[in-house]
């Protein structure tokens, strides 16, 4: 580094204090531009350091200095009598001490007068990447926020106090500070052990038990104990509980009480939230006991509607769906082991096992708290609810021939023509038609069988049509929805318009949906997108008869 001493004829001494932070160390040194002749006199004759060219500057400096504690650091005044006394005292000092005094005097002009006291400069090492300069602790002048808080406290109390205490009515600044501290302590609340350690060390740092500490001491203590508060929040706390006459001194007892209250509020909120969550996640056997009667009735209604929806989806594949195999497929597809799967994945897995669910059905299930999570389906709970719906569906089926038919379906799955003839007979027996001869002659006379069949309807769907008359209309319409969604292989929710028209007309005849051609054309025209049709609104329009 080049020598800082540069002599010039018109140079005025302007000492500057430079602080450099290198790694974990900080270096402090002074740079001064002395006058050409008076600098030599400064080293040899201490009394000439305060000659006339520098009287105005030193007088201006003395206004900013606090009262000295040492006799060698008396204030510089313009009174001649006091000036001679000060000269007499300074003449007895060594040149080194006088140079130190001058260095302290002129260090008050550090950083162009931004910091007015030498004791204010307090440096710490800065972590890597921290560009906020928040680790350089200094005592700034009172800002508008501090003065606003002080005047608010003064007006509410009606008397001048030594400390800016919290008013009885919480002000806007107090509520903001409370909210800020609670939010920052929400993730990492302060433990009671840490608060006790802080209180002991604060009392150690205050040997005279004045109740006040320097702001930099409090900040360094918080940093050493890793208190999870940013330095900006610590600074706001120090401003809030600072002394009125000296803003750099902070009432640490008030700060600790404030932190204890914020931590207590956070613990209470987290405790109530955890208690409510534990009640929600309790076992199903005790779930009804932990809810009030009104909530239990509402929950039972929701569960009943959910079971009805799942039973409606299970009816077409009753006896063919293996829920254990479905569970294994879900487990294989859950690569992240999160217990959740997206809706298109759930649709594709269910369709592989013969369970046809629509996007609308899954979106309805998302609103249930046990099945939906962030737009995905909790497949484990979904399988549990399918088990319950399947058990209820098997209990709802009447005893007798229907049970035998379901057992025959489970055993004799390859014999599809025989199963279909049985389904032809069952509705006829239940309806008890007047002429049973036609029922027995229908399979025996193939000529009349084909004559009575419409041209647009294939042979294999006659049984389905007769059986469909005993089903609900919404169940038959659900089959139309499943067929259209299965044709959408890419799960885009869009199908080719002409293909959708053919499918809707065909399934309208097969399942006797009684949809008018005019309404079908209106749905296709209203919800078309270019050459395609959007399935969900079109099907909803057809459903609203």
From Swiss-Prot:
Ranges of biased composition (kind: Basic and acidic residues): 34-44, 53-63, 415-428
InterPro entries: DUF5580, DUF5580_C, DUF5580_M, DUF5580_N, EF-hand-dom_pair
Comp. bias intervals (Polar residues): 69-78, 429-441
Pfam families on file: DUF5580, DUF5580_C, DUF5580_M
Annotated TM spans: none
Region called Disordered, residue ranges: 34-98, 269-296, 415-444
Disulfide cysteine pairs (residue numbers): none
Name of the molecule in the record: Uncharacterized protein C1orf87 homolog
Organism: Mus musculus (Mouse)
Gene giving rise to this polypeptide: Gm12695
């Amino acid at each position: 580094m080049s020598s800082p001493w540069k002599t010039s004829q018109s140079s005025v001494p302007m000492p500057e204090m430079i602080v450099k932070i290198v790694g974990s160390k900080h270096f402090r040194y002074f740079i001064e531009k002395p006058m050409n002749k008076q600098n030599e006199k400064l080293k040899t004759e201490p009394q000439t350091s305060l000659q006339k060219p520098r009287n105005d500057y030193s007088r201006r400096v003395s206004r900013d200095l606090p009262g000295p504690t040492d006799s060698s650091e008396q204030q510089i005044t313009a009174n001649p009598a006091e000036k001679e006394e000060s000269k007499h005292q300074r003449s007895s000092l060594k040149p080194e001490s006088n140079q130190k005094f001058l260095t302290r005097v002129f260090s008050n002009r550090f950083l162009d007068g931004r910091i007015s006291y030498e004791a204010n400069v307090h440096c710490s090492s800065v972590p890597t990447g921290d560009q906020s300069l928040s680790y350089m602790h200094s005592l700034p002048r009172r800002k508008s926020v501090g003065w606003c808080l002080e005047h608010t406290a003064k007006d509410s109390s009606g008397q001048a106090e030594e400390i800016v205490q919290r008013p009885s009515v919480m002000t806007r600044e107090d509520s903001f500070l409370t909210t800020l501290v609670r939010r920052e302590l929400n993730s990492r609340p302060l433990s009671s052990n840490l608060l006790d350690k802080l209180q002991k060390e604060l009392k150690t740092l205050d040997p005279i038990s004045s109740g006040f500490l320097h702001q930099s001491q409090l900040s360094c203590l918080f940093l050493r104990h890793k208190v999870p508060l940013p330095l900006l929040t610590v600074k706001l706390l120090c401003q809030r509980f600072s002394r009125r006459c000296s803003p750099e001194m902070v009432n640490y007892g008030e700060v600790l009480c404030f932190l204890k209250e914020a931590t207590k509020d956070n613990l209470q909120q987290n405790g109530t939230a955890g208690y409510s969550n534990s009640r929600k996640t309790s076992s199903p056997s005790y779930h009804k006991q932990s809810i009030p009667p009104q909530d239990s009735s509402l929950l039972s209604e929701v569960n009943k509607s959910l079971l009805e929806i799942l039973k409606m989806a299970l009816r077409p594949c009753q006896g063919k769906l293996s829920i254990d195999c479905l569970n294994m497929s879900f487990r294989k597809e859950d690569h992240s082991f999160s217990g959740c799967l997206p809706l298109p994945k759930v649709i594709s897995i269910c369709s592989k096992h013969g369970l046809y669910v629509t996007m609308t059905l899954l979106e309805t299930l998302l609103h249930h708290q046990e099945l939906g999570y962030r737009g995905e389906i909790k497949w484990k709970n979904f399988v549990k609810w399918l088990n319950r719906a399947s058990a209820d569906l098997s209990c709802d089926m009447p005893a007798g021939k229907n049970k035998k038919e379901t057992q025959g379906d489970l055993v004799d799955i390859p014999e599809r023509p025989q199963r279909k003839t049985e389904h032809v007979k069952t509705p006829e027996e239940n309806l008890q038609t007047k002429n049973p001869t036609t029922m027995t002659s229908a399979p025996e006379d193939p000529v009349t069988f084909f004559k009575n069949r419409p041209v647009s309807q294939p042979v294999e769907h006659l049984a389905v049509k007769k059986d469909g008359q005993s089903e609900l209309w919404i169940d038959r319409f659900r089959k139309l929805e499943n067929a259209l969604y299965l044709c959408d292989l890419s799960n885009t929710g869009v199908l080719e318009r002409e293909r959708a028209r053919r499918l809707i007309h065909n399934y309208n005849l097969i399942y006797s949906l009684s949809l008018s051609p005019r309404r079908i054309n209106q749905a296709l025209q209203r919800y078309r997108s270019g050459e395609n049709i959007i399935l969900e609104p079109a099907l909803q329009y057809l459903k609203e008869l």
